[in-house]
């Protein structure tokens, strides 16, 4: 039996965005690759007739985000003017949507799980994000799991909770996307429970897999290590076990593909946070000498306007990124002294390392030292904590456009050999 279904995400056509020219494939090329992939897999399967089968279903009620009194009054007045005619413009269309939601404040969702041996199949009557599918796959007790969207209904787009801060058409309260803000979390929880019921074992807890780079970081014994691989959370966990957890604030996109090198296909092993007005903030113990290292993905778009991005505020030391006339590079600016360097290319990962010691500052990009600046020590007192803000400035006025991954804090100055070795470890 073969199934061609609406998968987890509605983006059925495009292939892997990380592959060159993937979006220029013809329909014929795309279909041939899909058929070849499936046919190749079928030849390796062992066919059995004695596998366990199972089915589970539950129904949950979710609220819709009903309009307030002002919006409802506007809607009714406009519908009255329409005098029974069909809408002819966007306001009239939305007026009908507002009226319908106000009259239908609840929605019942049919959620299902199917077991075919070691395969788990989930069915959701909504169109959900790819992240929702990744949550289900990583939590599922089954060896293999896939999801079918728009099954048994069409209850609209269901974005993860954090997407409601970012906005977009999937968050507009209409028939197409009107369920409560917590809908995705409730759906994931209930469908995961069905998978547990079918398999007879509890869910798995997602932990970001280790790479050669992350293993090298752990071996270097950081004081704090925020890998930024969370699927959804207000906390960025400190992976060292030292308890220096950071806090997510504002607009961020979780669990995006993390750092990789341009000469490698994206394996999606590392996961990162995409910043859209939000921040990651951490309070760490004071250190007279310290090092902060992280992977940076410059997301500045091509524009004639000056775009000032603040990557981080590290206890008063600021790293900014500004676009230049040459779109192929952006200018990296280090403060308190305004020293600028070029060489940060858009849409690629760079390893940034800032070293602070009694002699001054060092700034490294990948395995090359870009700056060695003699300066007096920071003003922090020994008993004070240090505040690190990533994704923008500490005042909430200047944002960062791009992704960060694998932030490590060391309460000592890394040597040049250690920095180079950490960078080289990422290629293994």
Name these PLM-found stretches:
Residues 224-232, 267, 290-300, 351, ...:
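Extracellular, beta-strand-rich glycan-interacting domains
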Residues 373, 383-405:
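Extracellular glycan-interaction patches encoded by glycine-rich segments
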Residues 247-277, 292-302, 316-378, 394:
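Extracellular glycan-interaction surfaces
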Residues 279, 360-362, 403, 413:
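Structural motif
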Residues 114-115, 141, 216-221, 265-267, ...:
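Extracellular/periplasmic catalytic domains that process cell-envelope and extracellular macromolecules
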Residues 1-213:
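Non-catalytic substrate/cofactor recognition surfaces at enzyme active-site rims
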Residues 301-310:
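Beta-strand acidic-aromatic groove motif in beta-rich domains, primarily in extracellular
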């Amino acid at each position: 039996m073969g199934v061609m279904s609406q998968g987890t995400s509605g983006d059925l056509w495009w292939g892997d965005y990380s592959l060159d020219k993937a979006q220029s494939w013809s329909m014929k090329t795309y279909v041939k690759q899909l058929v070849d992939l499936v046919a190749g897999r079928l030849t390796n399967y062992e066919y059995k007739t004695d596998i366990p089968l199972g089915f589970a279903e539950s129904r949950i009620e979710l609220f819709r985000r009903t309009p307030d009194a002002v919006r409802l009054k506007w809607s009714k007045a406009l519908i009255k003017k329409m005098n029974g005619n069909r809408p002819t413009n966007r306001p009239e269309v939305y007026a009908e949507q507002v009226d319908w939601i106000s009259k239908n404040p609840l929605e019942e969702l049919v959620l299902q799980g199917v077991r075919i041996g070691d395969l788990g199949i989930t069915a959701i009557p909504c169109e959900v994000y790819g992240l929702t599918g990744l949550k289900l796959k990583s939590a599922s007790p089954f060896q293999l799991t896939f999801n079918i969207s728009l099954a048994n209904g069409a209850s609209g787009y269901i974005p993860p909770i954090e997407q409601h801060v970012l906005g977009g058409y999937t968050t507009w309260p209409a028939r197409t996307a009107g369920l409560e803000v917590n809908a995705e979390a409730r759906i994931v929880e209930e469908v995961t429970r069905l998978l547990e019921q079918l398999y007879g074992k509890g869910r798995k807890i997602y932990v970001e897999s280790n790479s050669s780079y992350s293993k090298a970081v752990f071996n270097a014994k950081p004081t704090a290590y925020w890998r930024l691989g969370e699927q959804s959370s207000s906390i960025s966990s400190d992976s060292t076990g030292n308890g220096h957890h950071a806090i997510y604030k504002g607009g961020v996109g979780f669990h995006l593909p993390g750092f990789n090198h341009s000469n490698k296909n994206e394996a999606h092993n590392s996961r990162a946070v995409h910043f859209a007005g939000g921040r990651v903030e951490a309070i760490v113990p004071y250190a007279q000498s310290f090092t902060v290292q992280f992977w940076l993905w410059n997301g500045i778009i091509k524009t004639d306007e000056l775009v000032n991005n603040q990557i981080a505020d590290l206890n008063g030391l600021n790293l900014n990124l500004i676009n230049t006339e040459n779109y192929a590079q952006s200018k990296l600016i280090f403060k308190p002294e305004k020293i600028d360097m070029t060489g940060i290319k858009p849409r690629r990962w760079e390893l940034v390392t800032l070293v602070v010691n009694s002699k001054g500052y060092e700034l490294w990009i990948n395995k090359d030292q870009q700056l060695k600046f003699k300066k007096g020590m920071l003003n922090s007192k020994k008993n004070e904590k240090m505040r690190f803000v990533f994704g923008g400035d500490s005042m909430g006025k200047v944002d960062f456009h791009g992704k960060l991954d694998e932030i490590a804090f060391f309460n000592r100055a890394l040597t040049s050999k250690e920095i180079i070795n950490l960078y080289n470890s990422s290629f293994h």
